[in-house]
Curated annotation (Swiss-Prot):
One of its GO terms (molecular function) is A-type (transient outward) potassium channel activity. Residues 600-623 are annotated as: Disordered. This is A-type voltage-gated potassium channel KCND2. Zn(2+) binds at residues 105, 111, 132-133. Voltage-gated potassium channel that mediates transmembrane potassium transport in excitable membranes, primarily in the brain. Mediates the major part of the dendritic A-type current I(SA) in brain neurons. This current is activated at membrane potentials that are below the threshold for action potentials. Residues 1-184, 250-256, 308-321, 404-630 are cytoplasmic. Residues 474-630 are annotated as: Important for normal channel activation and inactivation, for interaction with KCNIP2, and probably other family members as well. The transmembrane segment S4 functions as a voltage-sensor and is characterized by a series of positively charged amino acids at every third position. Channel opening and closing is effected by a conformation change that affects the position and orientation of the voltage-sensor paddle formed by S3 and S4 within the membrane. A transmembrane electric field that is positive inside would push the positively charged S4 segment outwards, thereby opening the pore, while a field that is negative inside would pull the S4 segment inwards and close the pore. The N-terminal cytoplasmic region can mediate N-type inactivation by physically blocking the channel. This probably does not happen in vivo, where the N-terminal region mediates interaction with regulatory subunits, such as KCNIP1 and KCNIP2. The zinc binding sites in the N-terminal domain are important for tetramerization and assembly of a functional channel complex. The channel undergoes closed-state inactivation, where conformation changes lead to inactivation through an intermediate state involving breakdown of its 4-fold symmetry. Detected in brain frontal cortex. GO terms for biological process: cardiac muscle cell action potential; cellular response to hypoxia; locomotor rhythm; membrane repolarization; muscle contraction; neuronal action potential; potassium ion transmembrane transport; protein homooligomerization. It comes from the Eukaryota. The chain crosses the membrane at residues 185-206, 227-249, 257-281, 288-307, 322-345, 381-403. Residues 474-489 are annotated as: Required for dendritic targeting. It comes from Oryctolagus cuniculus (Rabbit).
Length: 630
């Protein structure tokens, strides 16, 4: 059964998303189940422990799906006589109802991604969702795709700069995520400051600043201090122009960037300045220029790059486009209807201001939006009655879409809050990982010195005895692992500091033999689970000892460096103190070296009486592998 399921899965996944399976041969035949079936048998479906029962004919109504075809036999268990699916039982209820009723519905409380995965597994396409749920399903799916794309773009911009990134990619990354570097952060705050200055200057230049000498009429600040405001506007426009050109040059897709809303806002914000530079002193042209200067107020929308709340508001309006369209259409119909009624109701009054139906539009708009300026009021009884109805209908028309807009705003706001929280947690987690990796070698060696390899060496003439300290279960397991490695590989693992101390003792004191103070070599610390090779300990010479004291000892001849992607390689040289250029180049891209010291003893010398005796202190031909780099 397991082999059949494994062979079926790739074809089921391909068929579920509408792709034809690519294979050299046909699909494997489903396993034959030796059981008797009636024409309309009762089938038991076990979905993660939840049992569903239905008729076989109900499932076979749709033979192109998983449950309606013979492919469901791959999931049949003869012992329980059930079809077992390790899927979500809550969503499966809606899928099974589709076989019963022929209508597929989308549960609003379910995750859109999980729902799509279940449909893909059972071989159902989203296009068969009923009309009552299809629009909401498409909206949720589009919003989810946009959110995932935004999260992916944010994650890409928040990642650390790679060495392979080009200058163009670095500039775009600095614009999208100013916190990547100090210069990007400075430019971010400088542009924000000039945006605020530009908006404030656009407002202040219309404030009256008194009359200038030779003029009786009071002039606005923009005309009285024209040079100062021109210089200020020039500085702001220069900053905005440089920002726009840099964004255009660094954009991954310039065509997409030019079509974006923020790009259009940038162009509209700086365009009036350049048009004013080339315009003549003609009064007609100057009047058009004054009208064009109104577009400078769009610079305030540049704050959306600096404000998350404005971006959330934009996403909300975009997601509520259908509701806003319904509101606009309803208001338009109501305005036309009530303006027509009010015109004919007030037509008989001589003091009426409802001179035409378009003139009555203003009264209808002000009344339906519950503003009520009072500049136009009905005079007749019929006009007052219809005006009251217009006011009440306006409250109903405007109030209906508002809860939907508020709900979408709340949902998008909380989604962004959760996304920001996830990114902050990911950033903190990566920081902890980097901190742990940077201090891993020191922490490992410190733990060995404190608990793993910090035992006192108790040597005697007959047999060395070791005293171990009580440690945690992790330390005990680590001791046991080192103990088994020493017995099976005939290697001995010691701390680097203990190794140097032992070497100094060997250089100063000449004793017959000595054992390295390793917890893994202790008798009684761990159980004897590995067959021990015949091993004799020996003196470890110090590399720092002078040449006269070393004798014929060969200095640290070989270092083993393991590659992540390939088999272990060795890099040999006559001395580890030599430069790396003098050695054979490693044939791997990412070598790593562990912090350890391994002593390889030479075979023991057997006396004619059959007893083993330690070798002479010269250690001719002894090899020591010392790896002290991380």
């Amino acid at each position: 059964m397991a082999a059949g399921v494994a062979a079926w899965l790739p074809f089921a996944r391909a068929a579920a998303i509408g792709w034809m399976p690519v294979a050299s041969g046909p699909m494997p035949a489903p396993p034959r189940q030796e059981r008797k079936r009636t024409q309309d048998a009762l089938i038991v479906l076990n979905v993660s422990g939840t049992r569903f029962q239905t008729w076989q004919d109900t499932l076979e109504r749709y033979p192109d799906t998983l449950l309606g075809s013979s492919e469901r036999d791959f999931f049949y268990h003869p012992e329980t006589q059930q079809y077992f699916f390790d899927r979500d039982p809550d969503i499966f209820r809606h899928i099974l109802n589709f076989y019963r009723t022929g209508k597929l519905h989308y549960p609003r409380h379910e995750c859109i991604s999980a729902y799509d995965e279940e449909l893909a597994f059972f071989g159902l396409i989203p296009e068969i969702i009923g009309d009552c749920c299809y629009e909401e399903y498409k909206d949720r799916r589009r919003e989810n795709a946009e959110r995932l794309q935004d999260d992916a773009d944010t994650d890409n911009t928040c990642e650390s700069a790679l060495p392979t990134m080009t200058a163009r990619q670095r500039v775009w990354r600095a614009f999208e995520n100013p916190h990547t570097s100090t210069m990007a952060l400075v430019f971010y705050y400088v542009t924000g400051f000039f945006i605020a200055v530009s908006v404030i200057a656009n407002v202040v230049e219309t404030v009256p600043c008194g009359s200038s000498p030779g003029h009786i009429k009071e002039l606005p600040c923009g005309e009285r201090y024209a040079v100062a405001f021109f210089c200020l506007d020039t500085a702001c426009v220069m900053i905005f122009t440089v920002e726009y050109l840099l964004r255009l040059a660094a954009a991954p897709s310039r065509y997409r960037f030019v079509r974006s809303v923020m790009s259009i806002i940038d162009v509209v914000a700086i365009l009036p300045y350049y048009i004013g530079l080339v315009m003549t002193d003609n009064e007609d042209v100057s009047g058009a220029f004054v009208t064009l200067r109104v577009f400078r107020v769009f610079r305030i929308f540049k704050f959306s790059r600096h404000s998350q709340g404005l971006r959330i508001l934009g996403y909300t309006l975009k997601s509520c486009a259908s509701e806003l369209g319904f509101l606009l259409f309803s208001l338009t119909m109501a305005i036309i209807i009530f303006a027509t009624v009010m015109f004919y109701a007030e037509k008989g009054s001589s003091a009426s201001k409802f001179t035409s139906i378009p003139a009555a539009f203003w009264y209808t708009i002000v009344t339906m939006t519950t503003l009520g300026y009072g500049d136009m009021v009905p005079k007749t009884i019929a006009g007052k009655i219809f005006g009251s109805i217009c006011s009440l209908s306006g409250v109903l028309v405007i109030a209906l879409p508002v809860p939907v807009i508020v709900s979408n705003f709340s949902r998008i706001y909380h989604q962004n809050q959760r996304a920001d929280k996830r990114r902050a947690q990911k950033k903190a987690r990566l920081a902890r990982i980097r901190a742990a990796k940077s201090g891993s070698a020191n922490a490992y060696m410190q733990s060995k010195r404190n608990g793993l390899l910090s035992n006192q060496l108790q040597s005697s003439e007959e047999e060395p005895a070791f005293v171990s300290k009580s440690g945690s279960s992790f330390e005990t397991q680590h001791h046991h692992l080192l103990h088994c490695l020493e017995k099976t590989t005939n290697h001995e693992f010691v701390d680097e500091q203990v190794f140097e101390e032992s070497c100094m003792e060997v250089a100063t004191v000449n004793r017959p033999s000595s054992h390295s103070p390793s917890l893994s070599s202790q008798q009684g610390v761990t159980s004897t689970c590995c067959s021990r090779r015949h091993k004799k300990t020996f003196r470890i010479p110090n590399a720092n000892v002078s040449g006269s004291q070393r004798g014929s000892v060969q200095e640290l001849s070989t270092i083993q460096i393991r590659c992540v992607e390939r088999t272990p390689l060795s890099n040999s040289r006559s001395s580890l103190n030599a430069k790396m250029e003098e050695c054979v180049k490693l044939n791997c891209e990412q070598p790593y070296v562990t912090t350890a010291i391994i002593s390889i003893p030479t075979p023991p010398v057997t006396t004619p009486e059959g007893d083993d005796r330690p070798e002479s202190p010269e250690y001719s031909g002894g090899n020591i592998v010392r790896v002290s780099a991380l």
